[in-house]
Amino acid sequence: TLVEVVPWLTSLLENTFGNYLDLLTLVCIPASSEANNNARFEDFSKRLTNETDMDNAFDHIQVVKDATPKHLGGSGTPILHFDEDYFNGRYILLFDDVITKGNSMLRFKRKLEALGATVIAGVSVGKTTHERQNQSFVQI
């Protein structure tokens, strides 16, 4: 919950960046749909940036078209619009709630750097793990 995550992240970021934290801009990597993105990151980004004095980029990246799932022939990636001028010259802290391989974070790093930003770090609060299903073995 936000009540637990925001103080934990605030402490982590203050210990890591100290007095430089207010020079950073928080960029949450958008969810696959506008509705999910707003539900996941709008309140979170406001709370975290209020606690840390970072700038909040939430309103500067819009989900223009929701992602089409891969199993339906889509890319699984939403179409986004970036307020390009906003990112030029900024120092970015990327945030993804759950990371699997890091591809989204790498893609966003490259996109923001192409817009003139410098990505300082990326942070996540969870990692996807895949566990094998309980398999039945036949004894020989």
How should each PLM-predicted stretch be described?
Residues 1-24, 61-91, 101, 126-130:
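Active-site-facing substrate-recognition patch
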Residues 21-33:
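Short glycine-rich phosphate-binding loop at a beta-alpha junction
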Residues 34-38, 101-102:
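Loop/helix-junction capping segments adjacent to catalytic residues or to phosphate/diphosphate-binding pockets
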Residues 38-42, 46:
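Short, surface-exposed alpha-helical segments at coil->helix boundaries
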Residues 48-68:
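Histidine/lysine/aspartate-rich catalytic loop segments that bind and position anionic ligands
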Residues 55-57, 91, 118-121:
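Residues at the starts of beta-strands that form the adenosine-phosphate
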Residues 94-108:
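A phosphate-binding catalytic loop at a beta-strand-loop-alpha-helix junction
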Residues 106-140:
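PRPP-dependent phosphoribosyltransferase catalytic core
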